A protein has these predicted regions:
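AMP-dependent adenylate-forming
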Residues: 1-72, 76, 80, 85, ...
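Phosphopantetheine-attachment site and its flanking helix in carrier
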Residues: 77-81, 96-120, 132-136
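N-terminal ligand-binding/catalytic initiation module
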Residues: 152-289, 498, 507, 511, ...
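Adenosine-phosphate binding glycine-rich loop
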Residues: 196-205, 427, 432-565
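Active-site nucleophile and cofactor-binding loops and adjacent substrate-binding regions
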Residues: 295-303, 490-492
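Hydrophobic/small residue at the entry helix of a nucleotide-binding pocket
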Residues: 303, 307, 335-338
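Glycine-rich phosphate/diphosphate-binding loop of Rossmann-like nucleotide-binding domains
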Residues: 316-399
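Rossmann-like adenosine-cofactor binding region
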Residues: 378-460, 467
Length: 565
């Protein structure tokens, strides 16, 4: 919050120029969210500014370039109250924009979780990013288009065999009936699971999970049996209460130990909310349980290597030569930069790199640019700092690699014909429905997840359902159930495999906190040494068809660069 005194009359143009002046000179997190115009600054008897007497913003104060408008509907009122609490500001109006107020993706997840609970609707995070003002967001949530938007399904894609898959009905307390595990991947309830079961979040956690972590899957590999232990919490709630997260994760580790696992990997966003696993280690030590529980890894070095294998896969399927491509890299946090560095270590250098990140300031991007040049990269480097959407420059690349946490940051309508996308983002960085439709109909775009590896042989999987699920089979949507459980029988995610791979070799150790380029390279070489290959092109259980790939290869060879949309 900024307080200021003007010698001249206030205007919106003046406010905008003040904001621009600060944005040019300060990191984004330091730019004030609200600006309050005072006749004079309160002073102490010593003539210093009396900070305790500075007023909180009121509806007449200046926080944006629009007039304050209070909520008018029940939905607007609920959302406004949640915004006010999240930003610790009582003067939030329905025209206020989440991003202009200083919000980021982590705060967005917390707000969406609270709004979903308050409205008793499961609201996808991407909707919030599409409608960042309270007014527009409330209008969409209350509209008939909301249910149509969230219920649209993917095209069918390729058919898969299910012979590798079996089901068992078993309750948590029957641990003697579970297999002995060598490793565990710790996960959480996917948001789509509520739609599949027809249960509310609270009902699912109570009736399906019994308010406890439970073993939901086991995978029999040549290196041992991996279990998937799912925590009784939905993704959107992981950012809310750190104390409850601690308790839930520790319970998951204790169950893993009880099932025989000697090592555990953190999947999805669990590394992000635990300071890359360092919090988990501290909790184990504070509880004096470090000796009795499995070793823990984020698996981030394996994830990084898996992304590069996915890049290799899409290049091979498309018949593309990396040295002839421009590559846009979206997301330059620790995972993003490590992936970019590993790409330059093991693959031919592209002819150009476009670097983009919503949270990095231009000065920081220039530092990354200097690092690449110092490492020997000789191609063109463009940097694109942006606020709430990507620069058009990003779409000039033939290959887009996204390692982000901002949903739908990539506008599929802006993606050029002949573009490939590798996405390792939570949630996904683009609309998979729109991309799949375009791949099938036009054949001018192909894409894949950056998280899958092909093991070359079928992996036997057992899904463990609670006995209460037997009574629910009539209401479970079979098509949606299939969409979240079906995989290629020879493929598995890198974050799950990281559990069993950890300490299998001297070069594949635990990754906690920030990992080094040398660790990423070592994990990449280990994966190659096992003969693991890139997976099929896929996202969210949709598999890009061979026909779509052949269309793409035909269009790419013709050199088409027209913009679709």
């Amino acid at each position: 919050m900024a307080y200021f005194v003007l010698e001249s009359e206030f205007s919106n143009d003046l406010l905008n120029s003040i904001k621009e002046h600060l944005r040019d000179r300060l990191p984004g997190v330091m730019v004030p969210t609200y600006f309050v115009n005072l006749e004079s600054l309160p002073l102490t008897p010593n003539k210093k500014i009396d900070r305790t007497s500075l007023p909180a913003p009121e509806s007449g104060n200046i926080g944006s370039n629009h007039d304050f408008i209070p909520p008018r509907t029940i939905t607007e009122t609920i959302i406004t109250e949640i915004f006010s609490d999240a930003f610790d500001n009582p003067a939030v109006g329905i025209k206020d924009n989440f991003f202009d107020m200083g919000g980021d993706s982590l705060l967005a997840v917390r707000i969406i979780s609270r709004i979903s609970n308050a409205l008793q609707k499961e609201i996808p995070l991407e909707v919030f990013f599409r409608f960042p003002t309270i007014e527009k967001f409330a209008q969409f949530v209350d509209s008939p288009a909301f249910m149509e938007d969230v219920s649209e399904s993917l095209p069918s894609g390729e058919d898969l065999d299910t012979e590798y898959l079996s089901f068992q009905f078993i309750d948590n307390q029957e641990t003697e009936s579970f297999p002995n595990l060598d490793a565990v991947a710790l996960s959480y309830i996917p948001e789509s699971f509520m739609q599949v079961t027809g249960l509310s979040k609270a009902e699912l956690i109570k009736d399906w999970f019994g308010n406890k972590a439970r073993l939901t899957n086991s995978y029999k590999t040549e290196w041992g049996t991996i279990g998937l232990v799912m925590l009784p919490i939905a993704e959107s709630d992981l950012y809310n209460d750190s104390n409850s997260i601690r308790s839930i994760i520790m319970d998951g580790l204790r169950l893993s130990a009880e099932l025989g696992a000697s090592k555990v990997s953190l999947t999805g966003i669990l590394p992000l909310i635990t300071q890359d696993g360092l919090d988990v280690i501290n909790w184990m030590r504070e509880n004096d349980e470090e000796v009795n529980l499995p070793i823990v890894t984020t698996g981030n070095a394996t994830r990084c290597a898996t992304i590069i294998k996915s890049v290799e896969g899409i290049l091979a399927r498309s018949g593309s030569d990396m040295s002839e491509l421009r590559v846009s890299f979206i997301g330059l946090g620790s995972m993003g930069m490590s992936t970019l560095d590993l790409m330059l270590d093991v693959l031919p250098h592209p002819r150009g790199i476009i670097m983009s990140d919503l949270y990095q300031q231009e000065d920081r991007l220039k530092e990354f640019q200097d690092q690449l040049l110092a490492s020997g990269f000789a191609g063109e480097i463009d940097i694109c700092s942006c606020d709430t959407k990507l620069s058009d420059k990003v779409y000039e690349a033939e290959l887009i690699i996204a390692v982000s946490n901002i949903p739908n940051i990539i506008d599929i309508n802006k993606v050029r014909s002949g573009t490939m996308i590798v996405d390792y983002s939570f949630p996904s960085s683009f609309s998979v429905i729109d991309a799949a439709r375009r791949a099938e109909q036009n054949g001018d775009l192909i894409f894949t997840s950056g998280g899958q590896l092909c093991l070359g042989q079928p992996i036997e999987e057992i899904i463990y359902l609670p006995r209460v699920a037997e009574e629910m089979l009539e209401i479970i949507n079979p098509e949606k159930m299939q969409s979240i459980i079906i995989r290629d029988s020879k493929e598995m995610t890198g974050c799950i495999l990281a559990s069993i791979f950890t300490e299998m070799d001297s070069g594949v150790g635990v990754t906690l906190g920030k990992f080094t380029d040398a660790e990423a390279l070592s994990h990449y070489e280990f994966i190659n040494g096992l003969g693991l290959a890139p997976s099929r092109l896929q996202m969210q259980s949709y598999f890009v068809t061979d026909e779509a790939v052949e269309k793409f290869r035909g269009q790419s060879s013709s050199g088409s660069t027209s913009i679709t949309g």
